[in-house]
Amino acid sequence: MTEQKHEEYGADSIQVLEGLEAVRKRPGMYIGDTQDGSGLHHMVFEVLDNAIDEALAGHCDKITVTIHADHSVSVADNGRGMPTGIHPKEGRSAAEVIMTVLHAGGKFDNNSYKISGGLHGVGVSVVNALSDWVTLTIYRDGKEHFVRFVRGETEEPLKIVGDSDKKGTTVRFLAGTETFGNIEYSFDILAKRIRELSFLNNGVDIELTDERDGKHESFALSGGVAGFVQYMNRKKTPLHEKIFYAFGEKDGMSVECAMQWNDSYQESVQCFTNNIPQRDGGTHLTALRQVMTRTINSYIEANEVAKKAKVETAGDDMREGLTCVLSVKLPDPKFSSQTKDKLVSGEIGPVVNEVINQALTDFLEENPNEAKIITGKIVDAARAREAARKAREITRRKGVMDGLGLPGKLADCQEKDPALSELYLVEGDSAGGSAMQGRDRKFQAILPLKGKILNVEKARFEKMLASQEVATLITALGAGIGKEEFNPEKLRYHRIIIMTDADVDGAHIRTLLLTFFYRQMPELVERGYIYIAQPPLYKAKYGKQERYLKDELEKDQWLLGLALEKAKIVSDGRTIEGAELADTAKQFLLAKTVIEQESRFVDELVLRAMLHASPIDLTSSENADKAVAELSGLLDEKEAALERIEGHEGHRFIKITRKLHGNVMVSYIEPKFLNSKAYQTLTQTAAALKGLVGEGAKLYKGENEYDADSFETALDILMSVAQKGMSIQRYKGLGEMNPEQLWETTMDPAVRRLLKVRIEDAIAADEVFVTLMGDEVEPRRAFIENNALIAQNIDA
């Protein structure tokens, strides 16, 4: 597939089709949604895809992606380097043409790229058009070339800035704030895509670095699509150890596929064309399903497996518990839309059919133990499908499936247009009663749910239908259930709002409902129909004022606002008040939160001392000793002992030993911690506090004067004064609110807060549901331990 990779890739290879004018007017057509973050991350993917195309052509094996502290992103590869010669038609460097002209690129010239991820000549010029600035550094022909663009226009022509024996291209860009509502990148979203690319392109080392918090991950993932399947199944229980793998080429097209069954009831298939994911599958997936059904059925019939089990197997049975990655590569792929979510190239079908048929037949014949396990799983699925069919008929007769008889517990709304209707799923009859009284019955329906609904992660379909609460929910929604029956067009409400108590039981019920929607009605999540209500956690009374506060953070911020009213600190003749006092107080409270979270890993006394110390440097023994001396000087010798430890390969640590209640507590300050966002917060706070408040300082709050020899003392006094005469009530349940309060805080569209449920990484989401709701205890315990620090509002 890369037989033409040695063809000349120069200025003559770049073809120009049209200009950039339309991009800035309608960026969504080219890059996706510019407000929800998807378009922003797609900017990185466009540049990254260019580097991957160099790897596909056999010219690149190292790619580095960096999120910089100024929110710019750079993508560097060690490929051939963009062409730097003068373009014959445009009269300027080919690199400038690629960056400034839409549809200019080597992807339209089959000599330069035989296979590429669609028409990516669009990509990098669109990134340039939608960025405040772009810098392009090219290492080619023993020289380093540089050019800078501002809002899509060349600042000055490409120039040689020095000699270099490197080769490759580095693109760095700052996304335009006029186009994008938010330019905050998610490390996890970028990591998900890079992980896919690493599995799909053996031999390419991709590194992702986040300079904002020092996070770094290297993706040199081996195993190809088989390794990808193993990764997807790592939190599940595979039924057979050996992974099915197939690879074949024909007529310039290639098919690569890996499959492994696990003990779950869900199918998990990832499809790719030229490294681009297809969320909606397409001709390659259709062909795979057909050939898989035909081949496995032939094996089952030949070995009389179904006959002995007295069941008839179908295609759906074969996909229950299947984890599969299918990757096809072909020239000029055709998709159903600009988003490339569905492949429509018909020519790939016969190739998939031929490759999989032979490989799967051989796999089943040569691995009888695996074949027995897989066919046994399929027979079990067929039996369950038959039981589910009978259960479905019973429930249909009861009116559950078709929604003819609405449940008596449902307080429906008057509105008949689903787009204008809301359904609140409320925990308990008490809160349900308050919600029914407080709602706007014109468009708000209420369905109280009694107790905890069935955990569908562990239950087969027929058991789920037998659950009264689940059956009631299915009936109320009106869209049916199951592959044959579910129809989202029949859904009676386009806003389904989960409203539970702010305690552990409420969180559990919310998780059970999310599991139900994710596993049984994922399209409702994809369409953005599922929401989580945000009832307030606190009600504060201060004099005649009454205020509802969403969570701990909002409570602290509100208290801080009251504390700082008419407050000032006078130290060494300098007055600290207004915005300066407020900013410093917020920074200090943030540091306190960090100390609380990080004290699990680093001694709390030492973390507090860091607020009064210089930044710690462990790059040399001398600097590490200085840090030990300074921190020790801020602590009582009886409290903690610090010492420098020399580790492997020049790594240094500071060991902290402290006695507490007769126990010896040991923790470490490591380089990883010093590169974290948490430590950045502590050093920023230390810088803000340095020399701010000294001995003899005075705090004034209104008419009152207090002694305050540190900022922490002053803030403690202010917060204590603010809470005098105030009562703060913590709501444990929705039933504690009367109907008017529930409407005012949680149901009134003018003031309420709703969280929309979205899935950004399907594989990660699948893992979370398997971990939290599955049968395995150890992964769940590990998950809870690892995430305990970031959990909020957990009952003591």
UniProtKB/Swiss-Prot annotation:
Its cofactor is Mg(2+); Mn(2+); Ca(2+). Few gyrases are as efficient as E.coli at forming negative supercoils. Not all organisms have 2 type II topoisomerases; in organisms with a single type II topoisomerase this enzyme also has to decatenate newly replicated chromosomes. Its main location: cytoplasm. It comes from Neisseria gonorrhoeae (strain ATCC 700825 / FA 1090). A type II topoisomerase that negatively supercoils closed circular double-stranded (ds) DNA in an ATP-dependent manner to modulate DNA topology and maintain chromosomes in an underwound state. Negative supercoiling favors strand separation, and DNA replication, transcription, recombination and repair, all of which involve strand separation. Also able to catalyze the interconversion of other topological isomers of dsDNA rings, including catenanes and knotted rings. Type II topoisomerases break and join 2 DNA strands simultaneously in an ATP-dependent manner. Residues 421-536 form the Toprim domain. Belongs to the type II topoisomerase GyrB family. The keyword Metal-binding applies. The keyword tRNA-binding does not apply. Its EC number is 5.6.2.2. It is found in: Cytoplasm. This is DNA gyrase subunit B. Gene3D superfamilies: 3.30.230.10, 3.40.50.670, Histidine kinase-like ATPase, C-terminal domain. Mg(2+) 1 binds at E427, D501. Binds two Mg(2+) per subunit. The magnesium ions form salt bridges with both the protein and the DNA. Can also accept other divalent metal cations, such as Mn(2+) or Ca(2+). It catalyses: ATP-dependent breakage, passage and rejoining of double-stranded DNA. One of its GO terms (cellular component) is chromosome. NCBIfam families: gyrB, PRK05644.1, PRK14939.1. Mg(2+) 2 binds at D501, D503. It is an enzyme of class 5 (isomerase). One of its GO terms (biological process) is DNA-templated DNA replication. Keywords: ATP-binding, Cytoplasm, DNA-binding, Isomerase, Magnesium, Metal-binding, Nucleotide-binding, Topoisomerase. InterPro entries: DNA_gyrase_B_C, GyrB, GyrB_hook, GyrB_insert, HATPase_C_sf, Ribosomal_Su5_D2-typ_SF, Ribsml_uS5_D2-typ_fold_subgr, Topo_IIA. Heterotetramer, composed of two GyrA and two GyrB chains. In the heterotetramer, GyrA contains the active site tyrosine that forms a transient covalent intermediate with DNA, while GyrB binds cofactors and catalyzes ATP hydrolysis. Disulfide bonds: none annotated. The lineage of its organism: Bacteria, Pseudomonadati, Pseudomonadota, Betaproteobacteria, Neisseriales. The record marks K452, N455 as: Interaction with DNA.
